[in-house]
Design a protein with these regions (language model features):
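Hydrophobic membrane-spanning alpha-helices of multi-pass integral membrane proteins
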Residues: 1-5, 26-28
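Transmembrane alpha-helical segments
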Residues: 3-15
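Signature aromatic-anchored transmembrane alpha helix within multi-pass, membrane-resident enzymes
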Residues: 12-53
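Short periplasmic/luminal acceptor-recognition loop of GT-C membrane glycosyltransferases, typified by
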Residues: 37-42, 46, 51-133
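Aromatic/acidic, Gly/Pro-rich catalytic loop(s) in extracytoplasmic/lumenal soluble domains
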Residues: 82-86, 91-95, 120-203
Length: 203
């Protein structure tokens, strides 16, 4: 009987210890969630997030090494509509005869997806990033004009004889991919579809 009682007591003590550990871990998790909630989900204004980060002493670095106004996981979710609307307007402002043989080129799938979403998939978008590289190849068949974004002018001049600054700039204080210019590129120096294999950018 003694060993039965002792064993029962040990089992009860283990259950209490496990319960205490679970309660402690849950409490730590809840506290951590409450603290990090404003800086992990885009539900507050950027100014609030920035003030909150400073009040708790948090600092974040952007992928390009710059210290951001807000954390990059927030910054990368902002201003997509504004970016897409600028690209769409630039495309729609082309003459009708040119528009039918034009497309928008961007460097990553986030930009490409935003343009497709906010244009209701009415604007042809080309990107070499991930699956868009596959989807874009067929679109290159008849493209003569590109509204290009995400690289410097001299990069586009390697592929096009005429590269014009459109005067449209994606100005944003959030994220590292903003503050670049849209260029209108015409007169390709070679068949774009033939060089597309070299542009593959899978990550």
């Amino acid at each position: 009987p003694f060993f039965i009682i002792l064993g029962w007591q040990i089992i009860n003590d283990i259950k209490k210890l496990k319960r205490t550990i679970m309660i402690t871990l849950l409490s730590v998790y809840m506290i951590f969630t409450i603290i990090t909630f404003p800086i992990t989900l885009p539900v507050f204004s950027p100014s609030f997030i920035n003030d909150y980060m400073q009040s708790i002493g948090f600092k974040f670095k952007l992928e390009k090494g710059k210290e951001g106004y807000v954390p990059q996981l927030i910054a990368d979710r902002l201003d997509w509509r504004q970016f897409a609307q600028k690209a769409i307007k630039l495309y729609n402002d082309l003459p009708e005869h040119e528009k039918s043989r034009a497309a928008i080129y961007v460097v990553n799938y986030g930009q490409a997806g935003a343009i497709e979403l906010y244009s209701n998939y009415s604007v042809p978008v080309i990107s070499s990033f991930n699956n868009y590289w596959i989807w874009s190849k067929q679109k290159l068949e008849n493209v003569e004009t590109l509204m290009a974004y995400g690289e410097d002018k001299d990069d586009f001049e390697k592929a096009f004889s005429e590269v014009i600054d459109s005067g449209v700039k994606n100005q944003t204080e959030f994220g590292y991919q903003g503050n670049r210019t849209f260029y209108i590129c015409r007169n390709a120096k070679f068949n774009l579809k033939k060089i597309w294999d070299n542009e593959k950018n899978f990550r």
